[in-house]
Each structure stands twice: as C-alpha cells, then as structure tokens.
Amino acid sequence: MSVRTIATALAILAASAGLASAQAPKATGPAKPQQAQAPAAAAGPTRIQQFKAWGAYSYKSGASNVCYVLSVPTTKEPASVDHGDIFFIVSQRPGQNISYEPQAMVGYVLQPNSKVTVTIDKKNFTMFTKDKAAWVENAAEEPALVAAMKTGQNMSVSAVSGRGTKTSYAYSLQGIAAALKQIETCK
C-alpha cells in the first residue's frame, strides 16, 4: 500500500472521527451525523504490521491513540469509471469508547440518503451514508459484521455514487482476524 493511499485513508478517517457516534436507531431511520471535526495535531499513521490483505495502523489523536485495520479492494466495478481511493476500515478509538467500528470510504460523494450494502458470504449488512463514507446503520450489528469478517471468505461492498452510478468492490478477508487481534490492546 502506498504512502499516499495510507495518508488519504488517515485524512478521511480523522475527518470522519466526529461522525463515529452518529449511529441510527433502526426504528426511526438514520440520525443526522454530527459535524466532523478534525483532531488537533494528529500525527501521521504508523503501520504496526501487514497481515496479508489487511494492515494494522495507529496514530495519536490528542491524548489518545486511534488504531485501525485497513484494506483496499481487489476489484472495482464498473471498471470504466474513476473510483478514486477506496478503503474498508475497522477502527478502535479507546479515548472515545469506540471499539471495532466498520466504515466504508470511497473516493467520490455517495448518493444522499442512499444505503451501502456489505455482503459477507451471503450475509448482508446495511450502512448509512454521509458524503464519501458509510457506517453500519444499526450500531448493534457492528459486532456481527466484524465477526463475519473474521470468519468469512469473501466480502463485497455495493454503493451508489452521487451521479447515480452503481459501484461494487470485492475485498479479500485474508489476514483480517490477525490484524484485528493486533489492535485489540489499543489504548
């Protein structure tokens, strides 16, 4: 993974940190995410270790550490469009009491009020969207999504761009369990 790719992921992750707790109650629909706030004096990311398709990273945000695992898709559809930088991240922010928060990040603005679907071995998870990112719609399903990632073989992410283009991404789940284990003790 290139330095530019990692730096882009960090910038997006840092900018979206204020959205981390913007989870939607299932019965009432998605809540409006809070205004994103960039952390003060965030240091660049440090790669802890690479585990096949997934890297484990950390950076300092204020007085606390943020740890995350990150992967890029193995395929992007449709192949004829510029997708920009695409990532799937699972972050852990102990200073904010956030543990294993999955997030899809894309290089384009997603269609407003659209849903992103994550499919792992035929099990679907729904994410709500805001600008160039998506989070699990029902926070209570985050542990199930992470557990499915640890034991699954294949993961795909389907989205709709602001222009109405249907996009999909395939990810390898090789190394995700080891990468998550590596950030387990993030403090």
Predicted segments with their positions:
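Sec-dependent N-terminal signal peptides
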Residues: 1-23
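A generic "folded-domain core" signal
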Residues: 2-4, 22-187
